[in-house]
Amino acid sequence: MIDHSLFDYNERLRKETYECYEIAKKARAMGLDVSDEVEIPIANDMAERVEELIHISGIAGEIRELSKSMSREELSLHISKKVASLLKDNRVEALDKAVRVGLAILTEGILVAPLEGIKDVKINKNDDGTEYVSIVYSGPIRSAGGTAQALSVLIADIVRRELNIGSFSPTDDEIERYIEEVEAYNRLKHLQYMPTPDEIRLVLKNSPVMIDGEGSEEEEVSGHRDMKRITTNRIRGGMCLVLCEGLIQKAKKVLKYTNVMHLNEWNILENIGKNKSDEKTENKSEKYLKDIIAGRPVFGYPNRPGGFRLRYGRSRVSGLAAASINPVTMKILNDFIAIGSQIKVELPGKAAAITPCDSIDGPMVLTRSGDHIKVKSIEQAEKIKNDIERITDLGEILIAYGDFLENNRNLDLSPFTREWWEYYLNDELSIYKSRDPDQFDAVNISRKYKMPMFPGYDYFWHDITMEELNLLINAIANGIINDDSMMLDASVSEILIKLGIEFKKHNNKLILHEYYPLIVSCGFDLINEKIVKVSDERKNDVLGTVNALSGIEIKPRAPVRVGARLGRPEKAGDRKMKPKVHGLFPLMNYGGSTRSIINAARSGSIMDIELGARICRACGTETPFVRCPKCGMPTEDSDSEKKFKIDISKALDDAALRVSTDIGTIKELKGVKKLMSRRSVIEPLEKAILRAKHGISINKDGTCRYDMSDIPITHFKYNEISLTRQRLMELGYSDSDINEIYPQDIIIPRDAASYLLNVSKFIDDLLVNYYGLGPYYMCNSEDDLIGHLVIGLAPHTSGGIVGRIIGFSDVNGCYAHPFFHAAKRRNCDGDEDSIMLLLDGLLNFSKKYLPSTTGGLMDAPLVLTLILDPEEIDKEALNVDTLQRYPLDFYIATEKNAPPASIENMMKTMKVLIKDGRYTGISYSFDTGDISYGTRLSAYKTIGSMEEKIEKQLGLARILRSVDENDVAARVLSSHFLPDIYGNFRSFFTQEFRCTKCNAKYRRVPLSGRCLRCGSSNIILTIHHGSIVKYLNETKKVMNEYKLPDYLVFRINRLLEQIESTFDIENGNDTTLDALIENE
């Protein structure tokens, strides 16, 4: 267990991080980069991150002190007022900085939302001449989350009061413009919460602050245009997000703070949602079934028999929204679910990443020979996969208590599990803590000690009807006991399948080897090897009846099934720009469509291009390069742009010579068409050459990234991650078979190790041949990467965290402590993010490379957290439970449908442990044999054609007892195929034309028939009829094979008629747009 060694671990991280910084500082100081300083500052805590992000010096100390006694929300409001008071001489700056610093605190100082989510803060005037505050939001505000979005408006309100600025008074016409925009935005992007027009009116009429936004969408409003105080006709996405998903959706949370601070104008939020009780709303349990994509199967309908059975607990690789299933289930589902795959779920949240747990129940299947069996191993599943008639039960899905707590979902009734049953054991029965009773012992124990029936012998009685129970009782009365089995008539096979009882079918008879609990539950017993009826008592329902017949308490075995479908498949792969790029070197059109620097050089091109200008420190020459082309000395930034003529061939040869590389040995070397940074700053070409030499590509910020799905792990076995005991101990762990993982250690895929090995060689080559320093990594194999540091960074954030590689898995995802994921503001519901080698980030990242467009700062390491603080990470990780065994009171609470927060203290969540001054020494309730045991690559990623994908998806629906195959077919057509066909069909007649040589686009073909930019005559359509008809055959096939609703069949037939008549498909003619025009 981790205890005092955590201090040593943190000190080791500090030491090795500072070593990398020293190397990077020495390299950067040579003047061979666009900046002479390392551009990723270390922030030791949230206070420093906020200071670095917002560039307000001197507030870190106060943030740090007040955070000890205030909640994050209270702290943000207090510091915002403080900042405003310091800057009150400039009211606009005071407002701007106050709102941004408040939002930065709310988002732990690692999101880009405070910088880019707020485009501007202004003071404007109402029609009566009074002043008001306007906040202009943009798209990146989404990453802040609804509560932080709403509180940013509240912060502006509080600050404008401090500065004596009046309230916003909207006109009726402006309010109607907002309503039109919200409806249009929801149609384009889909809001998490779509408010009613009255709710929008209510908030806007009473909001003292104008919630504005920049025009983020191409689409414009059709009415309420050219308004004086709304400066764009385009739809304002940022405004829609803050208004709908912020203030209105999070109204209850906002009220908590407005009431405390006596902001009475906001009391109107109490009326949000009050009039919705009579409205027809979609059944929440079916939300996960929306927008089904072709090729991604549905595994179970809401609470339908045969689906995943809810089981409470946390494996060592679940929690933080991740759930575990038996690896055999992955195989039985035709490998569609792999380790790390996302599934959309009915409860407790919206989605979960899937991990393996072989200590929970696996699936049951009916074979073509009529046998009903439990599939107990992947090998067995592989053997029978072509002999499966029906999948009758998917087994259990393990969901942690902490996920119910996080989603504030009342606890659903737990099945009667072994861990619950053990609480009934006394000292006499302690032997059964280590082994299961057989069928006879189970019944006798229950009778003698008045205990519920042992789990597994309780069956799914709630899944059959009273009529079916009576048929089963009659069949048992005529059953025959033979040696160690019972023979029943095959007429009751469907009833036994529903009950989850195994049997073999032989000569129209069913042979049961496990039968004694069944006959006892139905009012029979064995006397002299004969089945004898001993009870005939009846109740109103099946479960009550079997309790009465048996005289034994039989609890529900599967009271809750969890509906699910495949979401995103797991992901692991190096980050590539599109197309792949080796360096941020602009080529315009000189490199051709492949952006080849080598081809541009061979053509002898002299490029005339505007770039960021630099001045030689020695001779004063102006150049875009970091080295002077005349004297070879370093240059410095002049903070200006200028047109330069660049001899690409000479630039390439000079760069290759400086890094001792023969260009002839490099197969491809790709640049970019143009630079997106503010001043078109060019990256040293030497770096692109070395990346190409080592087969790696670049991200927009100059770093080499590897993307992976996020998967939690709290404990690992050294032999499952390619470690030896000796290496394990060198990393600071004990020599135990199972170790609790340190908070910033990560286990990466083998493929990631292979990629990072090449990156390490690139870095060493760079250090030696470009900077003239010694190598650092010196890795000869993937195993040499163990112990090296990385930066973990999530999309939509601007703060990285140091991580350490400790091993490899065969899984397409990154196993790491829940705290590590939460430090990046991620959970494990299918999220993915990236890592880069620490020294790569320090040497090669530059803010000057980042795009100047909105969102350009996202996914960039603007600050780096060295040691994570559990108090400053995403709070979801604090809800992870840590018990080895859930207490009896937990199961009693599920019987009462209790709120999860009511039992939080007994469940020992991370939050409870931290209050006690520790967060290590935790446990888990279910073991997993091997974290790589299970399907490792989702079938969705290996199936090629759409025809095969839809065939596999619907083929699985056909054999799943928990799925309605006809409904799945209808949903696939309605949510995927038909919108695609309709959209492309409409776009065909309004499309642009494109030059294949320079990519210029035209609304109409130029009269000359040639491109006006490059003169090429090869101008083509951007939408071909093939994109319209590509799903037609699959649509027809599905319509003919499945029973679809009449309205859908009519809709499809009408669409087919339109398309076939337009393109004359029946006669085999390929009608072009020219032909259509001529026919007119």
Curated annotation (Swiss-Prot):
<dbReference type="InterPro" id="IPR004475">
    <property type="entry name" value="PolC_DP2"/>
</dbReference>
<dbReference type="GO" id="GO:0003677">
    <property type="term" value="F:DNA binding"/>
</dbReference>
<dbReference type="GO" id="GO:0003887">
    <property type="term" value="F:DNA-directed DNA polymerase activity"/>
</dbReference>
<keyword id="KW-0235">DNA replication</keyword>
<keyword id="KW-0548">Nucleotidyltransferase</keyword>
<keyword id="KW-0378">Hydrolase</keyword>
<keyword id="KW-0511">Multifunctional enzyme</keyword>
<dbReference type="Pfam" id="PF24846">
    <property type="entry name" value="PolC_DP2_cat"/>
</dbReference>
<dbReference type="InterPro" id="IPR056172">
    <property type="entry name" value="PolC_DP2_cat_dom"/>
</dbReference>
<dbReference type="InterPro" id="IPR016033">
    <property type="entry name" value="PolC_DP2_N"/>
</dbReference>
<keyword id="KW-0808">Transferase</keyword>
<keyword id="KW-0238">DNA-binding</keyword>
<comment type="similarity">
    <text>Belongs to the archaeal DNA polymerase II family.</text>
</comment>
<protein>
    <recommendedName>
        <fullName>DNA polymerase II large subunit</fullName>
        <ecNumber>2.7.7.7</ecNumber>
        <ecNumber>3.1.11.1</ecNumber>
    </recommendedName>
</protein>
<dbReference type="Pfam" id="PF03833">
    <property type="entry name" value="PolC_DP2_N"/>
</dbReference>
<keyword id="KW-0269">Exonuclease</keyword>
<dbReference type="InterPro" id="IPR056171">
    <property type="entry name" value="PolC_DP2_central_dom"/>
</dbReference>
<dbReference type="Pfam" id="PF24844">
    <property type="entry name" value="PolC_DP2_central"/>
</dbReference>
<keyword id="KW-0540">Nuclease</keyword>
<comment type="subunit">
    <text>Heterodimer of a large subunit and a small subunit.</text>
</comment>
<dbReference type="GO" id="GO:0006308">
    <property type="term" value="P:DNA catabolic process"/>
</dbReference>
<keyword id="KW-0239">DNA-directed DNA polymerase</keyword>
<dbReference type="GO" id="GO:0008310">
    <property type="term" value="F:single-stranded DNA 3'-5' DNA exonuclease activity"/>
</dbReference>
<comment type="function">
    <text>Possesses two activities: a DNA synthesis (polymerase) and an exonucleolytic activity that degrades single-stranded DNA in the 3'- to 5'-direction. Has a template-primer preference which is characteristic of a replicative DNA polymerase.</text>
</comment>
<dbReference type="GO" id="GO:0006261">
    <property type="term" value="P:DNA-templated DNA replication"/>
</dbReference>
